[in-house]
Amino acid sequence: MTKKAIIPAGTSKPIAPFVPGSMADGVLYVSGTLPFDKDNNVVHVGDATAQTRHVLEAIKSVVETAGGTLDDVTFNMIMIRDWADYAKVNEVYAEYFAGEKPARYCIQCGLVKPEALIEIASIAHIG
């Protein structure tokens, strides 16, 4: 197995020992992605719609850096802080995955920073 770290330009320094993406034999694993700026501050505090868009743009950047597109994403794991944001998350999500939808699950849970309303991890098959 060949494994390669995928780190888009301008990515914030991880707050733990991990990389934004790891590619192994054509499968890209995108780490849990939070609505952080380059300095690991939460962006769009209190706005689930904007945080979801920020997270999906970051995931798109990882996938594109690996040579793929969001059409290559086959699975998403979504974690939201408040179930009341579920409809807002789905509205933005549908914009990014307009064609063939990936499998996914969504759970409500606490996240690493209290201002973060969403985290998404993804799997994509590229190539």
Curated annotation (Swiss-Prot):
Function: Involved in pyrimidine catabolism. Catalyzes the deamination of 3-aminoacrylate to malonic semialdehyde, a reaction that can also occur spontaneously. RutC may facilitate the reaction and modulate the metabolic fitness, rather than catalyzing essential functions.
UniProt-recorded Gene Ontology molecular function terms: deaminase activity
Pfam families recorded: Ribonuc_L-PSP (PF01042)
Alphabetized UniProt keyword annotations: Hydrolase
Entry's Gene Ontology BP terms: nitrogen utilization; uracil catabolic process
Organism listed in the record: Pseudomonas syringae pv. syringae (strain B728a)
EC number per UniProt: 3.5.-.-
Signal peptide: none
Full protein name: 3-aminoacrylate deaminase RutC
